[in-house]
Each structure stands twice: as C-alpha cells, then as structure tokens.
C-alpha cells in the first residue's frame, strides 16, 4: 500500500510531505524543495558519491547512520528516518563537526565539489563507530571519487587520530 505522506526528521523538526512524488530523488528534493545546495550532483548514477547524504534509523533501540547516494534514492525512503545533509553538520554556534574540522586542518580537498560527499561518508562512519581505524576510514570513503586528485588528498585523513583529535563541538 502506498502512503499518502512521508514523515521524517530534519534537524530537530518533523517534516511531513503530503502526496510525495515517488519518482522524485532525494537529491532533487533537497536542492529544490529544501533549497539546500551543499549536496552536489555529479554522475546521477550513484557512482561518484558527490550526492552523499546520511539517513539515521532507529534499529534495536540504537540510531544507525547510513551514507546514501541521494541521486538514486527516492523521497519515500525518508519515511520514519532522520535526514542529515552537509549543511546540518555545523553546530548552532558555528563550530565545525570534527570531520569538517579535519578536512580543513589536513587540506582534504582541492576544488571542493566532492567535499560534501566525502564529509557525509566520513560523518556516517564517525557516528557509527567508537573506535576508528585506517581501514574503516578508507572503506567509508570508497564510494566517493575526486576528479581533481583521484581522492589522494582525502587519504591524508587515514589516521584515526586526525579525526578524533579534531575539535568536537559540544552538541555533536
């Protein structure tokens, strides 16, 4: 049975979309309806990761965060979940999330087009894991491509210490 609405959490606000278009991609919804343009469109095929967003879902009384390619995911997938986009990571007082801070500190991007996707993939990994490892970090960005450097600059973030020693905002 098709629902006549989609209900999800964005920041601390419950959003209800009445009669959602089941063919509208999350990328299109985020950029046109929410008017948030940090999430980028690269390949439109789910291969580059520029459009990566994070969905939070309650599973066995624990929120699990999943990096999702928004260009190949559709609005109905939001139902009952939390949507986190790159614009949501900065705290209310303007402090960067540790992943964003590490990107700045270690010069993790060149032109910046792919940066939001890398940040969201790393954010998902960061939220789901208390212990970070080099393998976990590299695995988390394996679905993201950088056309400028071939992702070489992002591999400078290999050290779990790079992410865990970056400033942690009080609300993250």
What are these regions (language model features)?
Residues 156, 162-172:
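Single conserved hydrophobic/aromatic residue that forms the stacking wall/gate
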Residues 1-158:
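Signature of N-terminal electron-transfer/Fe-S-associated modules in redox systems
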